[in-house]
């Protein structure tokens, strides 16, 4: 299965609410910042944004004072799982990032998708990739 198939079928899928809702954007990005696969509207990283995200996995709390930035958009960092999951909130939407052995799985959502639905979709794929040694 290609990385793009993982994004298209496992991240941009129906979130399971029975109403056909799905994430706004998603991607799988290597630890070096290279994009393995992404949805058509996934925002592009600017400057130090990706390295700051990776630093927060190594030093949990790094992003809390300044916020998490994606393509210049600021997300308030909310409770995640230190070293494993970063979650952010921006208005009626947010972001979930799950770190795996070789990559980071990104999911961005807007209402009516809920934070819990985004977390479930992103973390389910992230956990699967971890089980596969990826």
UniProtKB/Swiss-Prot annotation:
CDD domains attached to this UniProt entry: PROF (cd00148)
Tissue: Specifically expressed in mature and germinating pollen grains, and growing pollen tubes (at protein level).
GO cellular component terms attached to this protein's record: cytoplasm; cytoskeleton; nucleus
Keywords, sorted A to Z: Actin-binding, Cytoplasm, Cytoskeleton
Predominant subcellular localization, coarse grouping: cytoplasm
Record's subcellular location: Cytoplasm, Cytoskeleton; Cytoplasm
InterPro entries reported for this sequence: PFN, PFN_euk, PFN_sf, Profilin_CS
UniProt similarity note: Belongs to the profilin family.
Role noted for this protein: Binds to actin monomers and regulates the organization of the actin cytoskeleton. At high concentrations, profilin prevents the polymerization of actin, whereas it enhances it at low concentrations. At low concentrations, associates with the poly-proline motif of formins to enhance actin filament elongation rate. Acts redundantly with PRF5 to regulate apical actin polymerization at the tip of pollen tube and control polarized pollen tube growth. Functions probably by favoring formin-mediated actin polymerization at pollen tube tips.
Protein's recorded name: Profilin-4
């Amino acid at each position: 299965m290609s990385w793009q198939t993982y994004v298209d079928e496992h991240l941009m899928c129906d979130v399971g609410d029975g109403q056909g809702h799905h994430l706004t954007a998603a991607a799988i990005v290597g630890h070096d910042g290279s994009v393995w696969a992404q949805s058509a509207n996934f925002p592009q990283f600017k400057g130090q944004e990706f390295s700051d995200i990776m630093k927060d996995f190594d030093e949990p709390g790094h992003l809390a004072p300044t916020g998490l930035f994606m393509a210049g958009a600021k997300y308030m960092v909310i409770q995640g799982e230190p070293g494993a999951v970063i979650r952010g909130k921006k208005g009626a939407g947010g972001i979930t990032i799950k770190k795996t052995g070789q990559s980071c799985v990104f999911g961005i959502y807007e209402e009516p998708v809920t934070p819990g639905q985004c977390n479930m979709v992103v973390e389910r794929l992230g956990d699967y990739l971890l089980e596969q040694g990826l």
